[in-house]
């Protein structure tokens, strides 16, 4: 939600939430293509890693259940402090699957995917295809790479019901554009003593 929220200028509405069933179909198609290219069986595996803030279980529960319902495994970890991020767990999972000999390719989606660069480079050096999916605005390190395939989430068919309103000060159209407020003006009244 953070990367998408930064693009939208606020919390995503239902129309702008990514559809994980579409991402799942895309992963299956990629695994099929990789199977065809290598002549071996490549089975897609999808895992999502998330932190759960104290008292936040009810907020993430519907999302986690929806992910599990479409075939994604979910690793959930309590967010107890700034150092309790899930990136080390993601890296450990990638390394474990590689050590088990079942990793035939890797697709990484992360708002902070640059944390995976060293592992990605090692896998690429071994000949494994690596794709990073995310948003161009937040993954310049992957977009600029000669060895990583980058796919913008909006380029995956069916992920978003509507095109994202990707307007920023860095990419203004010639005719100009309205930048929507991050919150309603009435939020200024919240917390005021009446």
Question: Model-found features: residue ranges?
Answer:
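Domain-level signal for Mg2+-assisted phosphodiester chemistry and nucleotide/NA-binding surfaces
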Residues: 1-84, 129
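Nuclease catalytic cores that cleave nucleic-acid phosphodiester bonds
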Residues: 58-192
């Amino acid at each position: 939600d953070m990367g998408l929220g930064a693009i939208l200028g606020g919390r995503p509405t239902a129309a702008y939430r990514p559809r994980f069933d579409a991402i799942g179909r895309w992963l299956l198609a990629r695994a099929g293509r990789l199977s065809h290219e290598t002549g071996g069986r490549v089975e897609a595996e999808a895992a999502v890693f998330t932190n759960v803030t104290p008292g936040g279980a009810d907020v993430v529960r519907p999302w986690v259940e929806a992910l599990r319902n479409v075939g994604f495994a979910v690793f959930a970890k309590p967010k107890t402090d700034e150092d309790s991020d899930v990136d080390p767990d993601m890296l450990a999972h990638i390394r474990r699957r590689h050590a088990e000999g079942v990793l035939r390719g890797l697709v990484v989606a992360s708002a902070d995917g640059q944390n995976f660069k060293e592992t990605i480079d090692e896998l690429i050096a071994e000949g494994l295809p690596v794709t990073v999916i995310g948003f161009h605005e937040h993954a310049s390190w992957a977009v600029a790479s000669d060895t990583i395939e980058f796919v913008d989430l909006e380029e995956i068919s069916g992920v978003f019901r509507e095109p994202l309103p990707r307007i920023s000060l860095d990419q203004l159209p010639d005719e100009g554009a309205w930048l929507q407020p991050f919150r309603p003006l009435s939020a200024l009244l919240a917390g005021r003593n009446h």
